[in-house]
């Protein structure tokens, strides 16, 4: 009772079992702890709400926080989220009934989806980033992944843009589906139960982005597509997945005996891809045509060992020019244990390893990049 309102949960649920006269009933109690904009309503959990504004715009400029309570689908509408907006999502398992078979099933509730001619435009600023996270602001939930599903840009959606944004505590960060388009600028995606960024036959451009504590892959690119990453840092410390996975395959059966192929083109400049395991880049090309997995890395720090063995992709480093293949002895970051992925000011291997990109003059913190020999990764060293 002595805590400020800002740390009160937005939604509280309690499941009660009531026994009376030999009967048993189950009751769900719900309470709301803060004044907020609940979408589609305070009673939207377990439901799907589609918003259509006939090609217009829906601007989330209310000073109150926004709570996605259920599944929110944007169609034929540009959802514009201005700087400083706080978006919380109430996740959890929901129950539904298949209309054909009549059988019930459970699914992960709580996500934002963009479909058809919908478009997501997030316009945060360095001083006032837009934050997507779970709806439990209490300190004990701060480091818990998988509390809501994530952001899903479905097939064919164009013009999606996310700038100066933090996405955390979800199952996935952002998924971009077939022929969908996304530009990321100054975005952080972390503390996810699955992959941070997923592209499936998609078009993604990212600059000055940071991915870490993603239990799956930090960056996962499947079934081809076009991808460009500049000054990005993707790490995978203490988890099983690699910092980067790239594939031109879509499995059509459980054992992937049946599959489809689509060309992948990926370009990385001034990026850092590292983690605790010896291999932080994973490749899969099921075609004998090497051009269907077309990738190049320039002025990047990577970490590979088994990937470049004769029975894998021994030619990888020839497409990584110039690159530094990191070892456990190499220092890059200031404090991995504290999730501080700024560069060590004394001995970071990323120091002055980059090449100038005229269109990107500042780092994720807003520091000016060296015009002649910038640092690799999303942060520039400040001496």
Model-derived segments and spans:
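Feature for long, exposed domains in two main contexts
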Residues: 1-52, 56-60, 64, 72
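Buried hydrophobic-core signal for structured, non-transmembrane domains
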Residues: 12-19, 151, 165, 346-350
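All-beta strand scaffolds that present successive hydrophobic residues in beta-strands
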Residues: 60, 79-81, 119-124, 159-163, ...
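Beta-solenoid repeat scaffold
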Residues: 60-61, 74-86, 92, 97-99, ...
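Surface-exposed loop/turn segments connecting beta-strands in extracellular beta-rich domains
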Residues: 89-90, 135, 168-171, 190-194, ...
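Right-handed parallel beta-helix
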Residues: 135-153, 157-214
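Predominantly extracellular beta-rich ligand-binding scaffolds that present long acidic/polar faces
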Residues: 208-342
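C-terminal accessory segments
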Residues: 323-383
């Amino acid at each position: 009772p002595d805590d400020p309102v800002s740390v009160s949960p937005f939604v509280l649920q309690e499941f009660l079992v009531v026994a009376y006269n030999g009967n048993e009933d189950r009751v769900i109690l719900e309470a709301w702890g803060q004044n907020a904009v609940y979408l589609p309503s305070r009673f939207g959990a377990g439901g799907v709400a589609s918003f259509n504004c006939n090609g217009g715009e829906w601007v989330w400029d209310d000073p109150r926080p926004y709570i996605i309570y259920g599944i929110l689908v944007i169609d034929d509408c540009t959802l514009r989220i201005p700087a400083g907006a706080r978006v919380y999502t109430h996740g959890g398992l929901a129950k539904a009934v298949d209309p054909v078979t009549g059988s019930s099933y459970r699914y992960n509730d709580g996500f934002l989806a963009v479909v058809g001619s919908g478009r997501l435009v997030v316009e945060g600023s360095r001083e006032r980033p837009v934050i997507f996270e779970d709806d439990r602001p209490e300190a004990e939930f701060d480091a818990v992944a998988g509390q809501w599903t994530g952001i899903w840009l479905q097939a064919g959606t164009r013009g999606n843009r996310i700038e100066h944004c933090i996405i955390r505590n979800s199952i996935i960060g952002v998924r971009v589906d077939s022929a969908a388009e996304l530009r990321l600028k100054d975005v952080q995606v972390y503390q996810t139960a699955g992959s941070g960024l997923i592209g499936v036959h998609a078009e993604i451009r990212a600059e000055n982005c940071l991915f870490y504590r993603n239990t799956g892959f930090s960056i996962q690119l499947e079934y081809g597509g076009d991808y460009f990453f500049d000054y990005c840092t993707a790490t995978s410390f203490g988890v099983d997945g690699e910092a980067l996975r790239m594939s031109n395959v879509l499995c059509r059966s459980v054992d992937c005996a049946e599959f489809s192929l689509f060309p992948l083109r990926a370009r990385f400049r001034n990026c850092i891809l590292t983690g605790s395991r010896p291999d932080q880049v994973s490749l899969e090309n099921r075609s004998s045509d090497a051009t269907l997995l077309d990738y190049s890395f320039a002025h990047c720090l990577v970490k590979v060992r088994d990937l470049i063995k004769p029975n894998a992709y021994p030619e990888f480093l020839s497409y990584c020019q110039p690159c530094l293949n990191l070892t456990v002895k190499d220092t890059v970051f200031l404090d991995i244990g504290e999730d501080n992925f700024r560069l060590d000011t004394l001995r970071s291997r990323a120091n002055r390893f980059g090449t100038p990109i005229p269109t990107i003059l500042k780092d994720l913190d807003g520091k000016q990049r060296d015009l002649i020999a910038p640092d690799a990764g999303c942060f520039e060293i400040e001496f």
